[in-house]
């Protein structure tokens, strides 16, 4: 507890989504699953409310019923959002470039810290070895080299780094918002009509049973993953998803030592 495990899992899932990967998140207990799902469903974007992040929480029949209600609500929230694929691609490219720029800035910052530490160490050695001419001259040359590199790197202000972080976060949230909506809008596609019929079925017991049958079939699972690439469930209920086989690019297992 308190080690930031939930944030690490959330960041891993968001990165996987950005890279168009599918993820299965499983745990022995409900608590860590609910914690991660709640965080991913609570990312705000400007005045548009929460980002409709395409994660679905499955499990026992009660969880499945809630998932079907969530699918219906997400569809209502996103069906009228205008999506421009070319803009999304540009935003993704911009995000990638800004991340690279921020990475390079942080590398420069780390290198500068290391050089400043070396400069300080050399100055102390020169002060200690003033009576050793050869040693002092050698350290003087080293000091010049260090200071030359520091000059090449230049000053790096907190404001410069913070500006990149803030701009990068805003751009990323924009990308997440519209890309998430794009995924959810795939529910409109004719191939997903059978899923929408299950979602809109008025009989709760019947639609849970229908969905459990639906998600066991490989073809249906692959269609479902185009809408919800990130699926969370308990390790006990994971067997309900698809037939035996490989369906996910990544599997995150929390509390793995308790898994059976």
For each feature predicted by the language model, list its residue ranges:
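Short amphipathic alpha-helical surface micro-motifs
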Residues: 38, 212-215, 258
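SF2 helicase catalytic motif II
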Residues: 246-260
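Conserved helicase NTPase catalytic core signature
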Residues: 124-249
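Generic beta-strand/beta-sheet core signal
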Residues: 2, 26-28, 233-235, 251-253
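Amphipathic coiled-coil/heptad-repeat helices and related helical stalk/stem segments
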Residues: 5, 9, 216-217, 260
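Short helix/loop capping segments that flank catalytic or ligand/cofactor-binding pockets
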Residues: 34, 240-243, 260
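Short, glycine-/Ser/Thr-/acidic-enriched flexible segments
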Residues: 2, 30, 63, 220, ...
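P-loop NTPase Walker
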Residues: 1-114, 121-124
């Amino acid at each position: 507890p308190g080690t930031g495990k939930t944030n690490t899992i959330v960041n891993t899932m968001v990165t996987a989504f950005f890279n168009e990967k599918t993820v299965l998140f499983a745990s022995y207990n409900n608590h860590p699953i609910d914690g991660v799902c709640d965080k991913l469903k609570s990312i705000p974007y400007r005045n548009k409310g929460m980002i409709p992040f395409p994660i679905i929480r499955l499990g026992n029949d009660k969880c499945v019923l809630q998932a079907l209600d969530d699918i219906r609500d997400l569809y209502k929230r996103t069906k009228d959002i205008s999506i421009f694929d070319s803009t999304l691609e540009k935003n993704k490219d911009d995000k990638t470039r800004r991340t690279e720029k921020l990475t390079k800035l942080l590398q420069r910052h780390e290198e500068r810290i290391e050089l400043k530490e070396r400069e300080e160490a050399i100055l102390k050695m020169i002060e200690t070895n003033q009576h050793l001419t050869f040693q002092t001259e050698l350290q003087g040359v080293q000091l010049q080299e260090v200071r030359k590199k520091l000059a090449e790197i230049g000053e790096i202000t907190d404001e410069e780094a913070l500006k990149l972080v803030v701009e990068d976060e805003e751009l990323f949230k924009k990308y997440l918002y519209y890309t998430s909506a794009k995924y959810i809008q795939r529910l409109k596609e004719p191939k997903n009509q059978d899923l929408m019929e299950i979602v809109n079925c008025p009989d709760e017991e019947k639609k849970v049973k229908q969905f459990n049958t639906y998600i066991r079939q490989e073809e249906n699972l692959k269609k479902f993953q185009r809408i919800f690439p990130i699926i969370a469930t308990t390790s006990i209920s994971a067997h309900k998803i698809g037939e035996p086989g490989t369906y996910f690019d990544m599997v995150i297992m929390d509390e793995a030592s308790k898994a059976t």
